């Protein structure tokens, strides 16, 4: 019979694979930006938010905060690299006004992270306290990001059209939330359960809306249409297996869907 730790590891690895896929979801958007050498109306906000989320989860997973959390560090370390690449591309092809704003927000995030790191390491002297403080921050920012799909869901209900809510992306986000929620429940971790439970819930609602309104969606009037989805949180615990506790991957992605 499979042990709880082994089951948690398997679920965590699956969650990491799904999370990695979601981190790569905006690639078509940035491919378009590189080809046109212009960010057009796209905003850096979702990627800046994801960057902060990843930084918090990486800090949560290091041994001095939450021991044995190698998967949380690896998936969010990858997330930092991916989001950093997106932001570099965005910076290169943005007008000066957008560049200055992006740098200002990034500066605030770095100062905030420095304050969190110093405050936690100097003010909390046990793994439990450090995990609690950083975990609460991760839950807070992750939960806020999970509410962003409410806008697109409201638009679906108002227009009775799922034109701006791609089925595949909704399905993957639902599976991501379910996977990490299941992981968190194998060995209960409140900091992973809350944001991912919300993710599973909102993902399920999007799928229900899709089932209700896909038949009433009007035919496309253009050969191709670009849609910028609200941010999608990539949050989970990778083999908390490792963390004898948890591993958590976090992030949000804005994706352009070409139809």
Swiss-Prot record:
One Gene Ontology cellular component: plasma membrane
Source organism per UniProt: Oryza sativa subsp. japonica (Rice)
Origin: domain of life: Eukaryota
Subcellular localization(s) per the UniProt record: Cell membrane
InterPro entries: SWEET, SWEET_rpt
Extracellular side of membrane: 1-9, 67-69, 125-131, 187-189
Lipid bilayer topology: Multi-pass membrane protein
Annotated protein name in UniProt: Bidirectional sugar transporter SWEET6a
The keyword Transport belongs to this UniProt entry's keyword annotation: yes
Family under the similarity heading: Belongs to the SWEET sugar transporter family.
Topological domains, Cytoplasmic: 31-45, 91-103, 153-165, 211-259
Pfam families: MtN3_slv
GO MF, one example: sugar transmembrane transporter activity
Gene name of this polypeptide: SWEET6A
Job description of the protein: Mediates both low-affinity uptake and efflux of sugar across the plasma membrane.
Transmembrane stretches, start-end: 10-30, 46-66, 70-90, 104-124, 132-152, 166-186, 190-210
UniProt main location, coarse: membrane
The MtN3/slv domain, residue ranges: 10-98, 133-216
Keywords: Cell membrane, Membrane, Repeat, Sugar transport, Transmembrane, Transmembrane helix, Transport
Annotated GO biological process: carbohydrate transport
Quaternary context: Forms homooligomers and/or heterooligomers.
Keyword Repeat applies: yes
């Amino acid at each position: 019979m499979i042990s709880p730790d082994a089951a948690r590891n398997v679920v965590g690895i699956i969650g990491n694979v799904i999370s990695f896929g979601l981190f790569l979801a905006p690639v078509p958007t940035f491919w378009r930006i590189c080809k046109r050498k212009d960010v057009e109306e796209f905003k850096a906000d979702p990627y800046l938010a994801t960057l902060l989320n990843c930084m918090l989860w990486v800090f949560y997973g290091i041994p001095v905060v939450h021991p044995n959390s190698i998967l949380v560090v690896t998936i969010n370390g990858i997330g930092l690299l991916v989001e950093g690449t997106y932001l570099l591309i965005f910076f290169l092809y943005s007008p000066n006004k957008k560049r200055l704003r992006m740098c200002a927000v990034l500066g605030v995030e770095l100062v905030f992270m420095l304050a969190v790191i110093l405050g936690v390491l100097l003010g909390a002297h046990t793994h439990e306290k450090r995990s609690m403080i950083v975990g609460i921050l991760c839950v807070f920012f992750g939960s806020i990001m999970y509410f962003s799909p409410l806008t697109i869901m409201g638009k679906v209900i108002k227009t009775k059209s799922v034109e701006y809510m791609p089925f595949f992306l909704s399905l993957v986000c639902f599976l991501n939330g379910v996977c990490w929620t299941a992981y968190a429940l194998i060995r209960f971790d409140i900091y992973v359960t809350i944001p991912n439970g919300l993710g599973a819930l909102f993902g399920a609602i999007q799928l229900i809306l899709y089932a209700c309104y896909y038949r009433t969606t009007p035919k496309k009037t253009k050969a191709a249409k670009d849609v910028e989805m609200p941010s999608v949180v990539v949050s989970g615990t990778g083999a908390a297996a490792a963390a004898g506790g948890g591993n958590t991957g976090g992030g949000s992605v804005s994706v352009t869907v070409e139809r």
